[in-house]
């Protein structure tokens, strides 16, 4: 009996994807912990000096945040396109629950942050910081439960996080754009148009797309729009099918590039970003920072806003018949996953760096993100572990 690649793909691809994300999450946790240790050790000055070392026109920190992270956003774009066209988000019924839950998880944290910081325009720029979910961290924590967590919950969390990433990309493009240079922006549009034409003409070799993506990054970087947006735009132009008229399979340009990028991004790019940006020196840091509305807005937005926003929106969608509850999952388990959505880290810190130019505000942002993410990870894991425990008697 013959099985098409289409029928064999979902289980094997999702398992491999989840395994990679889980391992990547653990690597990211280790990188963040190491950054905190180094930033409070005798090597702290060397660590901070290295990040501010200029290599060509940019500092090392900027190369990491603007250039290296473009690969992360390229992978995010590939995942979004694959899931929307040929994956868990390919049909409206499948999109409803994670889509509605993701919307709740973006809106409520932003409201909590805005309520606490409404009287300070400088701080209010960070309203989007607690609205993100770190897919590697969250899936890494969920994977610690093994088979005790239904696979439907893992699919729900993965698809919700992908939609969360999509929302974050849109937010970055719209709200965190500097002064626009029209010549560079025009050149970026022309380059994107070239990518689109190549896609429509049936070009399936990756090299022309990758060369055009680098050119697009250069123009977007100089246009004032954040350069990482170039990674997502380029990803959306990569063909999903191996050739015009043929069905999607693992030989398609998109699948090949996604497979090539997955491990380097999970084990090199994101951990380097974590190591470069999670380092907080507690030397001379006043206790009042912990009670500052910026720190509290992010902490409470991630820990409370995310869980109530995601679970509340999901509960409403299920109860009104707009969506179905993940198969085999209890309400308690769904709530546990909603808590895990408060693990913001990568995207939250990234948006924080775009929001605040001052070192103090960036430090407060990182403290809020790290503490909110840690609380969400610990509480979500403990609740899910308790919910999976077999009943006695």
Swiss-Prot record:
Belongs to the NhaA Na(+)/H(+) (TC 2.A.33) antiporter family. The lineage of its organism: Bacteria, Pseudomonadati, Pseudomonadota, Alphaproteobacteria, Hyphomicrobiales. It is found in: Cell inner membrane. NCBIfam families: NhaA, PRK09560.1, PRK09561.1. Pfam families: Na_H_antiport_1 (PF06965). Keywords: Antiport, Cell inner membrane, Cell membrane, Ion transport, Membrane, Sodium, Sodium transport, Transmembrane, Transmembrane helix, Transport. GO terms for biological process: regulation of pH. This is Na(+)/H(+) antiporter NhaA.
